[in-house]
Amino acid sequence: MERIVVTLGERSYPITIASGLFNEPASFLPLKSGEQVMLVTNETLAPLYLDKVRGVLEQAGVNVDSVILPDGEQYKSLAVLDTVFTALLQKPHGRDTTLVALGGGVVGDLTGFAAASYQRGVRFIQVPTTLLSQVDSSVGGKTAVNHPLGKNMIGAFYQPASVVVDLDCLKTLPPRELASGLAEVIKYGIILDGAFFNWLEENLDALLRLDGPAMAYCIRRCCELKAEVVAADERETGLRALLNLGHTFGHAIEAEMGYGNWLHGEAVAAGMVMAARTSERLGQFSSAETQRIITLLTRAGLPVNGPREMSAQAYLPHMLRDKKVLAGEIRLILPLAIGKSEVRSGVSHELVLNAIADCQSA
């Protein structure tokens, strides 16, 4: 069992990583006997894990209600969020309740925002079931729902009480979702840890076949890196922005193509190549390093070009609505070397458009 602590003073919390955690009531600390829980999951995961998690919580004496949401990025919306509030109010659940997010990034982000908002804030626990949510979205307290005009535009910073990563969940993950998660894994190597990127080049095949020790190390290293960044910059005023490599381009793809048509990791993968091409055009990143990124993403089964039907010009309106925009200027996360990156403002729209075009004609 691996345990990592996100250090945020009184709001510090553990990330527990192991197989078989759904069999152990102690995995879901700080829940105690007699407490009330609303378990939030989706229609795909409910048949797989709902009864198991409900059972282990009830074994610990916890009173469990549940709400099952539709599955898909297109349902990460205010309308679906309202169904969680309705379920909480109908029981009713008070300010002493705990929300448990059993699912991937959509369930986790939406449940976290529900917890931040319900009665001005209740406790919640993240139980991520996808690789993407285990290495990224469940850690750090970013919660949100989407708006038709932009991804994650309505949300809050709100930290969980704990994160429970059961590696066994990956056994039921579709290959496309596994690849989507690997995009965020590769991101950590590009922005923060060149040695980890080297390790990924050597061990990607083991990850694709869900090798236990390799996957445990991979998830642990990603969580360590994210925990360090969040502890240093919880509300994304500086360092934490680096975690958005590829996301300014990627969110544009998701919004333009319709949420759910491109998985988040797929859009981020293409966006990371666009960021690398932008950095190349600025003369601060080599084509050889871009090729290393492209090769690793391709091996993972991820796209390295944007949608053919989406023009370069179509990216700009979405990018100008990005949450990182300051004083009307797009701020981009750009690699400087494998393992090193920067936040860059003032890049001309023409250069950005040319970099996007590079990734459409490649």
Swiss-Prot record:
<dbReference type="InterPro" id="IPR016037">
    <property type="entry name" value="DHQ_synth_AroB"/>
</dbReference>
<dbReference type="GO" id="GO:0008652">
    <property type="term" value="P:amino acid biosynthetic process"/>
</dbReference>
<feature type="binding site">
    <location>
        <position position="264"/>
    </location>
    <ligand>
        <name>Zn(2+)</name>
    </ligand>
</feature>
<dbReference type="Pfam" id="PF01761">
    <property type="entry name" value="DHQ_synthase"/>
</dbReference>
<feature type="binding site">
    <location>
        <begin position="71"/>
        <end position="76"/>
    </location>
    <ligand>
        <name>NAD(+)</name>
    </ligand>
</feature>
<feature type="binding site">
    <location>
        <begin position="169"/>
        <end position="172"/>
    </location>
    <ligand>
        <name>NAD(+)</name>
    </ligand>
</feature>
<comment type="similarity">
    <text>Belongs to the sugar phosphate cyclases superfamily. Dehydroquinate synthase family.</text>
</comment>
<keyword id="KW-0057">Aromatic amino acid biosynthesis</keyword>
<keyword id="KW-0520">NAD</keyword>
<dbReference type="GO" id="GO:0009423">
    <property type="term" value="P:chorismate biosynthetic process"/>
</dbReference>
<keyword id="KW-0547">Nucleotide-binding</keyword>
<dbReference type="GO" id="GO:0000166">
    <property type="term" value="F:nucleotide binding"/>
</dbReference>
<comment type="pathway">
    <text>Metabolic intermediate biosynthesis; chorismate biosynthesis; chorismate from D-erythrose 4-phosphate and phosphoenolpyruvate: step 2/7.</text>
</comment>
<feature type="binding site">
    <location>
        <position position="142"/>
    </location>
    <ligand>
        <name>NAD(+)</name>
    </ligand>
</feature>
<keyword id="KW-0028">Amino-acid biosynthesis</keyword>
<dbReference type="InterPro" id="IPR050071">
    <property type="entry name" value="Dehydroquinate_synthase"/>
</dbReference>
<dbReference type="GO" id="GO:0046872">
    <property type="term" value="F:metal ion binding"/>
</dbReference>
<feature type="binding site">
    <location>
        <begin position="129"/>
        <end position="130"/>
    </location>
    <ligand>
        <name>NAD(+)</name>
    </ligand>
</feature>
<feature type="binding site">
    <location>
        <position position="151"/>
    </location>
    <ligand>
        <name>NAD(+)</name>
    </ligand>
</feature>
<feature type="binding site">
    <location>
        <position position="247"/>
    </location>
    <ligand>
        <name>Zn(2+)</name>
    </ligand>
</feature>
<dbReference type="GO" id="GO:0009073">
    <property type="term" value="P:aromatic amino acid family biosynthetic process"/>
</dbReference>
<dbReference type="InterPro" id="IPR030960">
    <property type="entry name" value="DHQS/DOIS_N"/>
</dbReference>
<feature type="binding site">
    <location>
        <position position="184"/>
    </location>
    <ligand>
        <name>Zn(2+)</name>
    </ligand>
</feature>
<dbReference type="Pfam" id="PF24621">
    <property type="entry name" value="DHQS_C"/>
</dbReference>
<keyword id="KW-0456">Lyase</keyword>
<keyword id="KW-0963">Cytoplasm</keyword>
<keyword id="KW-0170">Cobalt</keyword>
<protein>
    <recommendedName>
        <fullName>3-dehydroquinate synthase</fullName>
        <ecNumber>4.2.3.4</ecNumber>
    </recommendedName>
</protein>
<dbReference type="InterPro" id="IPR030963">
    <property type="entry name" value="DHQ_synth_fam"/>
</dbReference>
<keyword id="KW-0479">Metal-binding</keyword>
<dbReference type="InterPro" id="IPR056179">
    <property type="entry name" value="DHQS_C"/>
</dbReference>
<dbReference type="GO" id="GO:0003856">
    <property type="term" value="F:3-dehydroquinate synthase activity"/>
</dbReference>
<comment type="function">
    <text>Catalyzes the conversion of 3-deoxy-D-arabino-heptulosonate 7-phosphate (DAHP) to dehydroquinate (DHQ).</text>
</comment>
<dbReference type="GO" id="GO:0005737">
    <property type="term" value="C:cytoplasm"/>
</dbReference>
<keyword id="KW-0862">Zinc</keyword>
<feature type="binding site">
    <location>
        <begin position="105"/>
        <end position="109"/>
    </location>
    <ligand>
        <name>NAD(+)</name>
    </ligand>
</feature>
